[in-house]
Amino acid sequence: MSSAVRSPRKKAASDTSDPDRTSSPYSLRETSKVPSRYRNEELYLSPSRSIKRTGSPKKSPAKRLNGGRDSPSVNSLTRNSSLTMLAKAALDYESSSCALEYIFQPKEERRPPRRALALSPPPAPSNDLLAKDLEMIEMHQNLVAGLDDLDNPANMTNEAVEHRDTQSFFNMFSTDQERSAMMKQFKTYKNQTSEDVSTFMRANIKKLYNLLRYKKARQWVMCEFFYSAIDEQIFKEENEFATIIRESFPNLKNWNLTRIEWRSIRKLLGKPRRCSKVFFEEERMYLEEKRMKIRSVYEGSYLNDPSIDLKDLPAKLPRPMVVGNRVFARIRNPYDGIYSGIIDAVIPKGFRIIFDKPDIPPTLVSDTEILLDGKLDLLSIAYFIEQANSKLPSGVRPFVAAVRDSSHPHLVRDVLVSRKIERSGGPLMGPNDERLNGKNAEMVGNFPLKFLVNLVKLTKLIDIKKGLIRQLNELNADAEIQNMTSDKYSKAFQEKYAKTIIDLEHVNQNIDINMNGIQDHHMYFSSNDISTSNMKPEAVRQMCSQQAGRFVEHCNQGLNVENVHALTLIQSLTAVLLQVRTMGTQKISAVDLQSLGDAISEIRTAIHPRNVAFFQDYVEVHMKQFHTIMLESGALAGTVSNRK
């Protein structure tokens, strides 16, 4: 290339008249922009650029609306209020998007924001939109006082924390349109009263509704949060691992152990068996057993079953639900889900529910699929046991009445029996009741005076009840007549009918009290004089088993034996001894001996095979001798007398 023909870049560099530019090692075009790191104090402006820029720099719509970056109103908002985080974020966004237009502008020194004051910023009457924004900011300045103190969140008010979280939520949206829309919703939310549902609450409810449209999501929510009153206390009791640690290591008081120490404990406990089919079947079986025990405690039927052990139940149980309680029930037909309703009737192991939704008919629902609408009232298990015991005659003791002892949680005791033992001096001293002590009780014709008083009261109460029933029948007939003529009953008739019902209820209560008193005397004075001569062998055997259960229960109060199999074996052997004593007081037959042999055979089948030899040596040998003696005396005598 010849020297006469030069490139435009070299020509522009040689024709320049600026000495500073000729000394620069870089040759730039006239329209080039000089980076800030290569500029000196004087900014280089190309002639073409300066000619084009005749007025103020180009502004974004937001800057034109708000008066520009250097607007006094915006600066005052920045200095006087910390609620303008959203406005500052918008300004930063605009400055970053238009950085090329302001690259040659001098850098602005902004004052650091101060703590928010409860002062109103000066409004800008020239712009209506800006005035609305300023009014909104003025309305929320007092709510966000303390928002600048981010280094110490403990000093922040609840409103400040809420606003900070809201601002972080707004920052998730990138465009100005989305931020403006969310700010509008935020303003609407702040202007609402406490009774209205907030915008964010509606959004959360909509998200939750969309989630619950899926069947698996509904199933997960039911399994995770829907607990019946019975299951809630079972699943919320002490962790199984904590129970095993407490029972296996009673002297371990410190739970802050190292990883090596916990590893040693896990080795001693062994490998757990979980997530297998057998494991889940056993867990379901244990859960159903606990449910059955809780139902028996509610009903009081545990007194009739000696095999029920209450020590594995929770220390507190919820109060049983009654008719009229509002509940949430899990149903599968005609709809599958959880619906609200009211208990209409109580049935065994469930309730009859009338639902609020008219499309669902009244349904029988199990008690394990019902959740009370409200707070559960928890009561001690000893309360339910005392309620069940109070319904029994005072002469009849419960067969099993074991509750937790707060001082010894691994032992069980009967509260009512322990009280009576403390007063009487021990289980073998006999009951200490004045009705059994002939010296202190007043007798009239060989009958206790209190027994006769109860009998007279009961007779009078029965006569009164007959009159009330007769009066109630007449009122029912009048009600049918009035129902035929009109749809309403007179106020006087309603009051008379209600008074009759209340009187009848009071009479029934008094009758129950006197009947219990008569039953008490009957149990006390006829228990020792029961004639077994006319009783069948099976009835005698059952009576002896019940007496043996009472003896074992009383004697176990001081020993606190927890092995159920051992207690059952002791009870069976005691029943055999009582049966032998009963047979020794009368003439027996071959049927009685057969009944005794059946009892011994049942005991032999219940014990462990390793103990059969001991049972034969120490029990059956003596029973064989007794059997021989009875055959020679009682049974043969009975046979001879029958022949004569």
From Swiss-Prot:
Q: Which GO terms describe its cellular component?
A: DRM complex; nucleoplasm
Q: Name the InterPro entries for this protein.
A: DIRP, LIN-9/ALY1, LIN9_C
Keywords, A to Z, come to: Developmental protein, Nucleus, Repressor, Transcription, Transcription regulation
Q: What ranges does the record give for the region Disordered, renumbered to this chain?
A: 1-77
Record carries keyword Transcription: yes
Taken from the UniProt record, the cysteine pairs bridged by disulfide bonds within this chain are: none
One GO biological-process annotation of the entry reads: regulation of cell cycle
Question: Could you give a GO molecular-function term held by this entry?
Answer: DNA binding
Where does the record place Basic residues bias? 50-62
UniProt lists the family membership as follows:
Belongs to the lin-9 family.
The job of this chain, per UniProt, is described as: Synthetic multivulva class B (synMuvB) protein. SynMuvB proteins are required to repress the induction of vulval development by Ras signaling and probably act by forming the multiprotein DRM complex that represses transcription. Required for the development of sheath cells in the hermaphrodite gonad and for the development of the male spicule, rays and gonad. In association with the zinc finger protein ztf-11, negatively regulates the expression of non-neuronal genes during neurogenesis.
Query: What name goes with this protein?
Result: Protein lin-9
Species this chain originates from = Caenorhabditis elegans
The gene it comes from is lin-9
